[in-house]
C-alpha cells in the first residue's frame, strides 16, 4: 500500500515513547490542509496511535483498535494482542477490508505497525515510520539514533523535518505526542 499525504513516525528511547506526524492533507496534487492532526492518545493516554491514509478509515480503525484493547477481561493493556485481533478482522471483514489506511500504535513497551493486509510488524530497532515520507523519516531516524544525546522527541522531530524536505506530500507542521 502506498498513501500520499502524510508521514508518521514512532520512536522509543530513554523510557519515552513518541509518535509524531506532519500536518499535510492532499487531494490528488492539491494541498487541502497543512495542520491536520493524524495522531491521538487512546485508552486514557496509555497508547499512542498514528495513521496514514484516509481520515475516515483511520477513525474507524482507531475505534476498532480501542475496542480490541478494552475487550480483555483482566484489564491488562496488551497492544500486541489487540493489534493481531484488529489485523485479523481488518483482513477478513468485508467492510473493514476496504479501508485504506495504515496504523502505528505504541505504548511504553511496544511499537507496532498494523496494515490492512493483515500484517502486524514490531520493528527490530525502536523506530518505525509509515506514509509517503515514511522511508525518508525512517532512514533519518536510524542515523539520528546513533547520537545517544538526542531524545525520542528530538529524533522524531528532526526525522520528520528531513522527510518534509524531500517528500512533496509531507510538510513541517509537526504534531508530537509522548508517553513514559
Curated annotation (Swiss-Prot):
The keyword Thylakoid does not apply. Its EC number is 3.4.25.2. One of its GO terms (biological process) is proteolysis involved in protein catabolic process. GO terms for molecular function: metal ion binding; threonine-type endopeptidase activity. Gene3D superfamilies: Glutamine Phosphoribosylpyrophosphate, subunit 1, domain 1. It is found in: Cytoplasm. Na(+) binds at residues 164, 167, 170. Allosterically activated by HslU binding. Keywords: Allosteric enzyme, Cytoplasm, Hydrolase, Metal-binding, Protease, Sodium, Threonine protease. The active site is at 6. It catalyses: ATP-dependent cleavage of peptide bonds with broad specificity. Protease subunit of a proteasome-like degradation complex believed to be a general protein degrading machinery. A double ring-shaped homohexamer of HslV is capped on each side by a ring-shaped HslU homohexamer. The assembly of the HslU/HslV complex is dependent on binding of ATP. PANTHER family: ATP-DEPENDENT PROTEASE SUBUNIT HSLV (PTHR32194:SF0), METALLOPROTEASE TLDD (PTHR32194). This is ATP-dependent protease subunit HslV. It comes from Borrelia turicatae (strain 91E135).
Amino acid at each position: 500500500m502506498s498513501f500520499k499525504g502524510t508521514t508518521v513516525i514512532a520512536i522509543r528511547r530513554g523510557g519515552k515513547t513518541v509518535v509524531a506526524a506532519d500536518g499535510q492533507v492532499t487531494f490528488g496534487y492539491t494541498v487541502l490542509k497543512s495542520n491536520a492532526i493524524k495522531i491521538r492518545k487512546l485508552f486514557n493516554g496509555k497508547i499512542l496511535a498514528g495513521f496514514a491514509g484516509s481520515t475516515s478509515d483511520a477513525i474507524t480503525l482507531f475505534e476498532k483498535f480501542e475496542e480490541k484493547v478494552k475487550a480483555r477481561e483482566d484489564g491488562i493493556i496488551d497492544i500486541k494482542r489487540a493489534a493481531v485481533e484488529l489485523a485479523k478482522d481488518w483482513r477478513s471483514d468485508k467492510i473493514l477490508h476496504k479501508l485504506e489506511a495504515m496504523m502505528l500504535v505504541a505504548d511504553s513497551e511496544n511499537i507496532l505497525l498494523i496494515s490492512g493486509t493483515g500484517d502486524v510488524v514490531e520493528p527490530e530497532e525502536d523506530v518505525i515510520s509509515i506514509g509517503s515520507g515514511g522511508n525518508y523519516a525512517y532512514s533519518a531516524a536510524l542515523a539520528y539514533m546513533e547520537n545517544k544525546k538526542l531524545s525520542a522527541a528530538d529524533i522524531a522531530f528532526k526525522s520528520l523535518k528531513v522527510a518534509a524536505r524531500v517528500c512533496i506530500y509531507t510538510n513541517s507542521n509537526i504534531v508530537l505526542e509522548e508517553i513514559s
